[in-house]
Amino acid sequence: MKEEETAWTYVFDLDGTLYPIANGYERACRTRVFEFMVKHCPGVETVEEARSVWSGAFRRYNQTLRALRSLGFDGFDEEEYWAYTRSDAKEALAPVESTRAFVESLRGKKYVFTNCHEKQAKEALVALGLSDCFDGVFGAGDMGAVCKPEPAAFDALFSRFDVRDPSRCVFFEDSLKNLRTANRSFDMVTVLIASDTLTEEIDARAASRRPNAAADDDDDDDDDDDPTAFVDAIVRGGELTIESFSRASFKPTERAVEACADALRGASCT
């Protein structure tokens, strides 16, 4: 069998995966979203109103720009939106050698898959000292009308980078919604970076199941006692390093151990 047919491919989310969500940068970006809405969305006059409008729409559309367009807010320039809401990466983010060491330990093609625009994603990677670690970046501009967790966004990623067997891909991500699609639709190896994002999604999921709440079809088959039951591995602490991965909880399969054997060997040598 040819080497390329057995090699693993590694796909990484950006926010909350390649840097800890507790860093505060993602929260600052969200605050700038609310400020942008006050400036550019008619009828939204305060940050509190913006947060309320954003909350329900984001849960449904999974990306702020799509959510705003769906609500009829289209009188602003997309480049201006991304530049304003994702600014200051070089001030907020800094290289973390232990995360770089983890990424470098993996032998195979490596890609970043993010719902933010690829231009701003690349700026963040430069700030993180990771820009030379990846074979490609796939972002909102590349996806067009779709985004994670929609299967069409994954299909577009695979097509762009000629990924022929998604089951030989490992997906590192802090969002259960996105991992769920990777697992159900493509049989990818899924690695959850457990952080505040997980808490937010579980809380939102619980709220959606209260009486009179709209059902969330994506959650219908989840284990009520453990919504993370489907993932292959859970990295706790919100930071992706060789050490944290070596302490990960490997859940239903050992595929994650096989796929990330190089990183685990690195842990045994430290």
Predicted regions and their residues:
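Proline-centered loop/turn at the N-terminus of a beta-strand
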Residues: 109-111, 189
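Catalytic-core regions built around general acid/base machinery
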Residues: 98-107
